[in-house]
């Protein structure tokens, strides 16, 4: 619209004004045509169509003619002019008839309106805006906020879990009527395939605990959560408590820096007395930062979210103040901490592992199932199952483990690996569900319709004890067979010698033979007998017991009898079994099978020494319940034991474990005719 000379001069003048610091950066509006607003008033004109413009535009005749031709003078004649319709259009419009809305359609519209009600709720809009901005931050959308934010971020599972805890609790407290609808939205937003009711109840809890190894971004992740909550949640009150003042001050400055550089243009950000507040015109969102040495600052507050960083190292006096917020129904307390398992004072939150409701989330490089085997291998740095994720910025190798333990013995397991050491040491090996299933579900082995599915071989393990001390040890005998992929217990005996005057070998052999003959007579489909007599205590006595059992059994039945043979010191195969390092392997295999439901008992179980006073299965379950693992020191082989103080011995459970262990085909070659 301007001539070449005028346009050049205006552009030059505009460039000069842009360089001045006193002049605002945005001097040309995109909403209004004020391109000549900076020229002198003598050269300005006000035009109906052009607005404030340079007076030179009046000399541009085509522009003036165009404006005059299409000018709206707001004349009454134009507004009152009668509109003319074509006759065919008028007749077609007259023939149109409208049907009344059906009840089904009206109901569907009401349902649709109810479904979309959530998305029109102002509280939901705040949650949705928070999720949108957080997703933008993860994708690197805030490149101007903080150095490094331009890179895409991938959250660890515990960080995503922490974020869900925060958002879901806020959604439940702010929109209680639409809580279930918000849940569906969160499942979609976080791309969760399935969420059980138990998990939903966990998210609704007023307190949750995260135990995470060091250097995993616990404090780093809290900063954006607080920042975006302040921006989008109107009227929210957040509390942050750290174990040291310099940590709380660091988080305070980082949150303030992020708020001022991200959205200070839209909101007023204020930092006063360790409180960051954002004015939303209608209400203020605040975040208070304190240390455990000044817990009086959090008294009297009305927090919606209270974050306790490094909770294991918070002073116990301050913990009482923090736990007082549990009485407020709109407060969520999140404890986040690393652990040092050398001291109970720095891992006391692990006691929550036995809580009736799940509130403890433990992150470790090693799962609880393989923690002990990991401890035994001095150079291991990864879990054998490789199920756990290790971030790329974490470097763990055998040299790191050796170096840490050189500075302080056990430092690698106590300080670096994670917070499961104290939990796993007291973990029961046999689950309650498997014990109840073993006690209730017993197969009937006399059912003729099931004969074809039962194994034809009976395995018997005998652990002799040559003492009369009932508290020390007794003779354990177990008879086990197969049923498809499961193992059936046919007979159990726990025999104690009356006195040392009688022949111990004869008494033990008679007890075992009596049970074996009874089992064989009840189950005619058994056509082979495999016996293993333990010879660790006395090999000569074990050989004699084997011979006596063979004579007693073969005198009553024509079944084929095989014994487990082991070379003696003269390299002669003898009918006894020497238990060695394979005991630990047998116990671990039994635990796996028992917890998986592969160990079952027969309804017609034979027992002459137990059945008089106890149910043999309940008697066996008492010993199974006592089964525990004993680790002497790091790098040493662990042992298993079922002995507890003032409780019965573990002879019977050892016999059952070894009988099921020897059922494997890999041991078949060791069974021979004696």
From Swiss-Prot:
Which positions are catalytic residues? 310 (for atpase activity), 463 (for nuclease activity), 534 (for nuclease activity), 651 (for nuclease activity)
Q: Which cysteines are disulphide-bonded?
A: none
What stretch of residues is annotated with the motif Walker B motif? 305-310
* Coiled-coil residue spans: none
Q: Name one Pfam family in it.
A: DNA_pack_N
**What residues form the membrane-spanning segments?**
none
Its name, as the record gives it, is: Tripartite terminase subunit 3
Organism per entry: Human cytomegalovirus (strain Merlin)
């Amino acid at each position: 619209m301007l001539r070449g000379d005028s346009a050049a001069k205006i552009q030059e003048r505009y460039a000069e004004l842009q360089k001045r610091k006193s002049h605002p950066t945005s001097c040309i509006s995109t909403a209004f045509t004020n391109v000549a607003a900076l020229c002198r008033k003598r050269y300005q004109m006000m035009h109906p169509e052009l607005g404030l413009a340079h007076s030179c535009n009046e000399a541009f005749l085509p522009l003036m003619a165009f404006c005059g031709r299409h000018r709206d003078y707001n004349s009454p004649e134009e507004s009152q002019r009668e509109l003319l319709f074509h006759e065919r259009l008028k007749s077609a419009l007259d023939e149109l008839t409208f049907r009344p809305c059906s009840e089904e359609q009206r109901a569907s519209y009401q349902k649709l309106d109810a479904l979309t009600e959530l998305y029109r709720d102002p509280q939901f809009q705040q949650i949705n805006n928070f999720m949108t901005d957080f997703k933008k931050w993860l994708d690197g959308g805030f490149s101007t906020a903080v150095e490094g934010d331009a890179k895409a971020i991938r959250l660890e599972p515990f960080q995503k879990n922490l974020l869900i805890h925060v958002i879901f609790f806020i959604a439940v407290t702010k929109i209680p009527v639409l809580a279930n609808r918000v849940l569906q939205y969160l499942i979609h937003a976080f791309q969760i395939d399935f969420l059980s009711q138990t998990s939903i109840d966990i998210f609704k809890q007023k307190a949750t605990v995260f135990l995470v190894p060091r250097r995993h971004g616990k404090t780093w992740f809290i900063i954006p959560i607080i920042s975006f909550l302040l921006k989008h949640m109107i009227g929210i009150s957040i509390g942050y408590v750290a174990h040291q003042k310099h940590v709380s001050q660091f988080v305070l400055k980082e949150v303030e820096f992020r708020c001022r550089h991200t959205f200070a243009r839209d909101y007023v950000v204020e930092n006063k007395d360790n409180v960051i507040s954002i004015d939303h015109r209608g209400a203020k969102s605040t975040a208070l930062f304190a240390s455990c040495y000044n817990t009086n600052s959090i008294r009297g507050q009305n927090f919606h979210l209270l974050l306790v960083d490094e909770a294991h190292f918070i002073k116990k006096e301050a913990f009482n103040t923090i736990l007082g917020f549990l009485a407020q129904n709109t407060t969520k307390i999140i404890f986040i901490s690393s652990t040092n398992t050398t001291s109970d004072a720095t891992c006391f939150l692990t006691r929550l592992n036995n809580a009736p409701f799940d509130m403890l989330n433990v992150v470790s490089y090693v799962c609880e199932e393989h923690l002990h085997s990991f401890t035994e291998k001095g150079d291991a740095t990864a879990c054998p199952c490789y199920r756990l994720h290790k971030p790329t910025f974490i470097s763990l190798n055998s040299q790191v483990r050796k170096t840490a333990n050189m500075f302080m013995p056990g430092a690698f397991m106590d300080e670096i690996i994670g917070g499961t050491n104290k939990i796993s040491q007291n973990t029961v090996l046999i689950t309650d569900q498997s014990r109840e299933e073993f006690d209730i579900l017993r197969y009937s082995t006399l059912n003729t319709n099931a004969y074809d599915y039962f194994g034809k071989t009976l395995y018997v393990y005998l652990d002799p004890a040559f003492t009369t001390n009932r508290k020390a040890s007794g003779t354990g005998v177990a008879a086990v067979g197969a049923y498809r992929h499961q193992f059936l217990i046919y007979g159990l005996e726990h025999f104690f010698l009356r006195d040392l005057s009688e022949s111990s070998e004869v008494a033990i052999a008679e007890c075992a033979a009596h049970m074996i003959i009874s089992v064989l007579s009840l189950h005619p489909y058994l056509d082979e007998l495999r016996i293993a007599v333990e010879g660790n205590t006395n090999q000569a006595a074990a050989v004699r017991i084997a011979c006596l059992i063979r004579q007693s059994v073969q005198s009553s039945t024509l079944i084929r009898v095989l014994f487990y043979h082991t070379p003696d010191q003269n390299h002669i195969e003898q009918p006894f079994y020497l238990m060695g390092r394979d005991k630990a392997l047998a116990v671990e295999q039994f635990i796996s099978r028992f917890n998986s439901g592969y160990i079952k008992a027969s309804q017609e179980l034979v027992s002459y020494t137990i059945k008089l006073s106890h149910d043999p299965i309940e008697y066996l379950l008492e010993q199974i319940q006592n089964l525990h693992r004993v680790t002497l020191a790091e790098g040493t082989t662990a042992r298993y034991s079922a002995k507890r103080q003032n409780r019965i011995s573990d002879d019977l459970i050892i016999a059952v474990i070894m009988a099921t262990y020897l059922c494997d085909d890999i041991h078949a070659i060791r069974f021979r005719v004696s």
